[in-house]
Every structure is written in structure tokens, then in C-alpha cells.
């Protein structure tokens, strides 16, 4: 299925590219998320007429993500308090939602979908380095300190 990308998509293309993707990917993800439109003649003409507007929107989103990344880097660390046993193992775990809430409480708006936990939920006390993907091209890390209650 031919689509026109309205956003930069990693491993797929940039704003304005016409790409061929599987039908399900287009119908279930790209089009509902507003990241692409079907490549019909009318849509191609519409996009070419408004190409500068879409590129400017993409540039502002990138700039906003970079500004948020700088704010997260300026935080240095975030502390989360949780119940834990004597050996440092948590009763439960710290998930992406808990980390996003803690960073938001510290003053930087972050959604749980932007938090990347490579090893899964945090299950021990101590320092953990957490990665954030704020945009397709913008990554940052933050030290999360889990303390026993």
C-alpha cells in the first residue's frame, strides 16, 4: 500500500516520502496515528501544496523534544520510594508509568510511552540508568534512584 509520510518514521522515511508499506501497518498504525495518508492523486496534490507547513511542524516537534531532553538531563536524578525487603528486592516493581510520574512531578512532562526500560521493570533498590525516547531522533538518559521505604 502506497502512503505519504506526514512524520519522520525511523527505518521508513522522512516527511513527504512516498513509501510502500504493508496494508495492516498503514491501516492500523500509520493512518490512525496521523503519521501518514493514502497516496491518492488528491492527497499527493494536497501534500505538495502544504509541504512547507508539514516540514515546519516536524521541525518544531523536534525542537520541543530537544528542549525537553535538555530539561531531563538537567535533573541529573529522580528518587522513587518503594517498599522493599532486607536484601534490596522490591515488593512489586517500578514500571514506566512510575518513572514517568516521578519525572513529571520533578517538572518535566513525560509520558510512559517515552520511557525505555531495556531490562524490564526495576525490581531492586539502587541506581538505575533509564533511557527516554522523546522523538524519533531524540534520546536522553536519567539516573533513577530507587530507595526502600
From Swiss-Prot:
InterPro entries: Ribosomal_bL9, Ribosomal_bL9/RNase_H1_N, Ribosomal_bL9_bac/chp, Ribosomal_bL9_C, Ribosomal_bL9_C_sf, Ribosomal_bL9_N, Ribosomal_bL9_N_sf. Keywords: Ribonucleoprotein, Ribosomal protein, RNA-binding, rRNA-binding. It comes from the Bacteria. Pfam families: Ribosomal_L9_C (PF03948), Ribosomal_L9_N (PF01281). Coiled coil: none annotated. One of its GO terms (cellular component) is ribosome. One of its GO terms (molecular function) is rRNA binding. One of its GO terms (biological process) is translation. Belongs to the bacterial ribosomal protein bL9 family. Binds to the 23S rRNA. This is Large ribosomal subunit protein bL9. It comes from Actinobacillus succinogenes (strain ATCC 55618 / DSM 22257 / CCUG 43843 / 130Z). The gene is rplI.
